[in-house]
């Protein structure tokens, strides 16, 4: 889990537009966040395995 202070800091408006960055909406992780889902790779994988993301299924080939 991310620090509460860093999550609060990311919610405030940035001084410059280049300072804005994405965070996972579920856990607050700043790295490896998918823009389409607003989730980090770990949370996305977890929800996909549980079947909570419509249209997403495990790949097999």
Curated annotation (Swiss-Prot):
Question: What domain of life?
Answer: Bacteria
Q: Is Zinc a UniProt keyword of this protein?
A: yes
GO BP term, pick one: translation
Its GO CC terms are: small ribosomal subunit
**Requisite cofactors:** Zn(2+)
UniProt keyword terms in alphabetical order: Metal-binding, Ribonucleoprotein, Ribosomal protein, RNA-binding, rRNA-binding, Zinc
Q: Which InterPro entries match?
A: Ribosomal_uS14, Ribosomal_uS14_bact, Ribosomal_uS14_CS, Ribosomal_uS14_sf
A single GO molecular function term of this UniProt record = structural constituent of ribosome
Q: What does the UniProt cofactor note say? A: Binds 1 zinc ion per subunit.
Q: Where does Zn(2+) bind?
A: 24, 27, 40, 43
Q: How does it assemble?
A: Part of the 30S ribosomal subunit. Contacts proteins S3 and S10.
- Membership in a protein family: Belongs to the universal ribosomal protein uS14 family. Zinc-binding uS14 subfamily.
Record-linked PANTHER family: 30S RIBOSOMAL PROTEIN S14, SMALL RIBOSOMAL SUBUNIT PROTEIN US14B
Q: Which HAMAP family match?
A: Ribosomal_uS14_2_B
Chain's role: Binds 16S rRNA, required for the assembly of 30S particles and may also be responsible for determining the conformation of the 16S rRNA at the A site.
Q: What is this protein called?
A: Small ribosomal subunit protein uS14
Which organism is this protein's natural source? Limosilactobacillus fermentum (strain NBRC 3956 / LMG 18251)
Provide the organism lineage as a comma list.
Bacteria, Bacillati, Bacillota, Bacilli, Lactobacillales
The gene designation is rpsZ
């Amino acid at each position: 889990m991310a620090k509460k202070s860093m999550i609060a800091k990311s919610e405030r408006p940035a001084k410059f537009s280049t300072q804005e960055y994405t965070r996972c909406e579920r856990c607050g992780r700043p790295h490896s966040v998918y823009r389409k889902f607003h989730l980090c790779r770990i949370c996305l994988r977890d929800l996909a395995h549980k079947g909570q993301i419509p249209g997403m299924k495990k790949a097999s080939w």
